[in-house]
Amino acid sequence: MSTNGESPAPEGAGDSRDPSGFLSEIIGAPVTVKLNSGIVYKGDLQSVDGYMNIALERCKEVAEGRVIRNWGDAFVRGNNVTYISADNA
């Protein structure tokens, strides 16, 4: 039981940081973006807004660990995004 009046995070819940705070911390960092269609993009996160619209630089489309296509700069509409993951640099 939490002593500060807050409910403890469920076991296995992971990091409980605010997603918008996390995203602002990783601007300029390498990320992986997975779309609802299953397509995966890797690139440097340049911006993200409240609708999860994402701008990437040095964007590459990746499948099965291989680069399929280099896109350069790319914009991804937020309603297509399944997740954004920070990559280890």
From Swiss-Prot:
Compartment(s) where it occurs, according to its Swiss-Prot or TrEMBL record: Cytoplasm; Nucleus
Q: Where is this region: Disordered?
A: 1-21
Question: What CDD domains does the annotation carry?
Answer: LSm6
| Keyword list, A-Z | Cytoplasm, mRNA processing, mRNA splicing, Nucleus, Ribonucleoprotein, RNA-binding, rRNA processing, Spliceosome, tRNA processing
Q: Which Gene3D superfamilies match?
A: 2.30.30.100
Molecular function via GO: RNA binding
Every copy of the Sm domain together lies at: 18-89
Q: Listed GO cellular component terms? A: nucleolus; P-body; sno(s)RNA-containing ribonucleoprotein complex; spliceosomal complex; U4/U6 x U5 tri-snRNP complex; U6 snRNP
Give one Pfam family. LSM
Q: Determine the domain of life of the protein's source.
A: Eukaryota
Assign the protein's first listed, main location to one coarse class. cytoplasm
InterPro entries listed in its UniProt record: Lsm6/sSmF (IPR016487), LSM_dom_sf (IPR010920), Sm (IPR047575), Sm_dom_euk/arc (IPR001163)
Biological process terms in GO annotation: maturation of SSU-rRNA; mRNA splicing, via spliceosome; tRNA processing
Quaternary context: Component of the heptameric LSM1-LSM7 complex, which consists of LSM1, LSM2, LSM3, LSM4, LSM5, LSM6 and LSM7. Component of the heptameric LSM2-LSM8 complex, which consists of LSM2, LSM3, LSM4, LSM5, LSM6, LSM7 and LSM8. The LSm subunits form a seven-membered ring structure with a doughnut shape.
Write out the function statement from the record: Component of LSm protein complexes, which are involved in RNA processing and may function in a chaperone-like manner, facilitating the efficient association of RNA processing factors with their substrates. Component of the cytoplasmic LSM1-LSM7 complex, which is thought to be involved in mRNA degradation by activating the decapping step in the 5'-to-3' mRNA decay pathway. Component of the nuclear LSM2-LSM8 complex, which is involved in splicing of nuclear mRNAs.
Q: Which family does it belong to?
A: Belongs to the snRNP Sm proteins family. SmF/LSm6 subfamily.
Name of the protein: U6 snRNA-associated Sm-like protein LSm6
What is the originating organism of this protein? Phaeosphaeria nodorum (strain SN15 / ATCC MYA-4574 / FGSC 10173) (Glume blotch fungus)
Gene that encodes it: LSM6
